[in-house]
């Protein structure tokens, strides 16, 4: 009888010694631990700009001076180019003076600007986002139609901050304040997109926790990650 050569590393048929079919083996999982920050980069700048101008004409209190309009147009042009420093000062002003119902296009421009170097530090952009969304008042905002969009866009701004220039270091310095603010979020206001944005912020902070041995707020982060993981199931049970 013939002798089967077993010295080869190739898979062989034990009866004939010829190569045999071997199903493709699953590739090793390369998704965990996640080490790349996630962000929300898609934005329709022209639509956000047009909506802001429309609201300035239709919502009482959402006023734009000629200088304001010029500043916004300059910002939109810079965002379209995607290079240089974004002149965001106008957004901080309007997010503190416009009615809540008209702020969502401003927040959309802010979260787009948060991906870049800006005329204001990232810490200010984070503050502008949370103030602009009236985050502390969202628990009483279930009947405010714009609240879900405002909350979602504020969270997207925080998520985008991780990929901004010096973003990881800045978001690390804000970790205690940010995580304490996001702890026990206003779930009744967050829609699916808002839930995804919150999960992305939590994921980005978990990357910091994994990659930075000095991260000191793991317990607070774990509470948020647990809520993000289980709250949708809890909400579904409560509905039934």
Where are these regions (language model features)?
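Extended, low-complexity intrinsically disordered regions enriched in proline/Ser/Thr/acidic residues
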Residues: 1-20
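Generic low-polarity alpha-helical segments
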Residues: 1, 95, 106, 237-240
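Structured C-terminal portions of repeat-based eukaryotic scaffold domains
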Residues: 193-240
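Alpha-helical solenoid scaffolds in large eukaryotic transport, assembly, and signaling factors
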Residues: 25-175, 195, 205-206
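Alpha-helical scaffold repeats of the Armadillo/HEAT/TPR superfamily
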Residues: 124-135, 170-183, 214-230
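Short inter-helical turns and helix N-cap capping residues of alpha-solenoid HEAT/ARM repeat scaffolds
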Residues: 98-99, 143-147, 187-191, 229-235
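Short secondary-structure capping micro-motifs at structural edges
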Residues: 92-95, 182-189, 225
């Amino acid at each position: 009888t013939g002798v089967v050569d077993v010295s080869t590393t190739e898979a062989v048929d034990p009866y004939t010694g010829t190569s045999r079919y071997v199903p493709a083996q699953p590739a090793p999982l390369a998704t965990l631990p996640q080490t790349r920050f996630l962000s929300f980069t898609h934005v329709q700048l022209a639509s956000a700009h047009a909506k802001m101008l429309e609201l300035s004409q239709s919502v009482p209190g959402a006023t734009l001076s000629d200088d304001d309009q010029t500043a916004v147009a300059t910002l939109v042009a810079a965002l379209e180019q995607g290079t240089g420093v974004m002149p965001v000062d106008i957004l901080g002003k309007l997010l503190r003076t416009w009615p809540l119902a008209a702020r969502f296009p401003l927040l959309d421009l802010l979260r787009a600007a948060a991906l870049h170097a800006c005329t204001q530090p990232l810490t200010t952009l984070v503050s502008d986002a949370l103030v602009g969304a009236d985050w502390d008042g969202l628990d009483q905002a279930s009947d405010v139609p714009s609240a879900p969009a405002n909350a979602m866009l504020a969270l997207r701004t925080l998520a985008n901050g991780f990929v901004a220039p010096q973003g990881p270091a800045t978001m690390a310095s804000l970790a205690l304040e940010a995580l304490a603010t996001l702890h026990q979020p206003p779930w009744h206001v967050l829609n699916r997109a808002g839930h995804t944005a919150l999960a992305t912020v939590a994921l980005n902070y978990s990357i910091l926790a994994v990659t930075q041995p000095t991260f000191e707020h793991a317990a607070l982060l774990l509470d948020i990650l647990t809520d993000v993981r289980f709250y949708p199931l809890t909400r579904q049970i409560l509905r039934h």
